């Protein structure tokens, strides 16, 4: 079988690399520990005593004696104390104490490995053009998506465990909002949003009915269109709920990063990075793509500028470039988050009253402690967009070349396979060959049911939906942090 050929070798080599090399040379660790990120250290109690002008306390009458032990009152200092936090570069030792660091490192490093496997497989398919092999890189991409969704689910459940129900209410509210939004989008005709979902589902239903007829069963569609869209909307609502806080956090980091940026080019890239999901959403709006990109009006005539296949390829490349830009701007956003420690201290100085030294230390240390949570909220949507796009290219039978070319198909000689099944092979080896051939026929039948048209429509919609959810939540977060919070 072709399945145990070059692709399996590539998978085994990459598994060995992940086990032997990545623990020593990790991209996830380098993104945090390359020396560009600086975190704020919390002041010690002795430093706070000196700043507050207090001497080391001895035993006083105010101390309580309880079961033979003396409990002293917690030390408090004025909030308007002249405190300046010291910074330090993030090192590998510092990351050991970070919450969710193993999950962050695993997701990023596994994504790198899966992307390399995908690239090698694409080169192999481009030159060798195998027709009877399973594309193992698809399994890697699906694993990446499952890990990203699992991490986002874990982060979302963390908000449900908090005693304060504010975060829980936000997740539930946005979940219902995205469910209604998904149902509304799925009702819109393809004259406005060109996912190809209707065409793909119709092709799936027809192929399934033909398959059932060949098996001598009643020729009914396995699932109705309404049921399909209902369950798809439920899945989309969960994705939207998972992306709620990543979008809200992105908006806050975007505003803080803009305040830190001094160069015009950096500010421009930050704006493009924030609007990247909107650009992705507009790529599937048919009036824009058909009337202004593919057939731009020049005078009284509209001249075709490119074919649909060329535009599909350009759309894939644009999404990948925007994902690369988001990864490049990761450092600016994480540094903007780390600066929240000093920002909280500056805000505290404007308030009246006193604060305990323990609370002050917790307020400063908490920012760095949750650095990997913020990094996951930044990286996970990026990973989902990237690998959904890669799946769209492969399963949707698109091409990477922008020049017109015939789209390759994967023909399966069903007649030859069927003849092999019913050929008489009395030996044990012959029976094994019959079993293998029957499995091959079953897989080819599944290929005829789950066609590229179905995957193209479904994955186009999911890619668009992830970008739409991310932009919706980040836009709401921008409005909230800009106008509804007290500066």
From Swiss-Prot:
GO terms for cellular component: plasma membrane. Its main location: membrane. GO terms for biological process: regulation of cardiac muscle cell action potential; regulation of heart rate. It is found in: Cell membrane. The keyword Isomerase does not apply. Pfam families: Tmemb_161AB. Keywords: Cell membrane, Glycoprotein, Membrane, Transmembrane, Transmembrane helix. It is a multi-pass membrane protein. InterPro entries: Transmembrane_161A/B. The chain crosses the membrane at residues 107-127, 136-156, 169-189, 228-248, 265-285, 305-325, 367-387, 459-479. It comes from the Eukaryota. Glycans are attached at residues 34, 135, 203. PANTHER family: RE42071P, TRANSMEMBRANE PROTEIN 161B. Essential for maintaining normal cardiac rhythm in the developing heart and for neonatal survival. Inhibits potassium and calcium currents in the cardiomyocytes, this assists in timely action potential repolarization and thereby maintains normal cardiac rhythm. Belongs to the TMEM161 family. This is Transmembrane protein 161B. It comes from Homo sapiens (Human). The gene is TMEM161B.
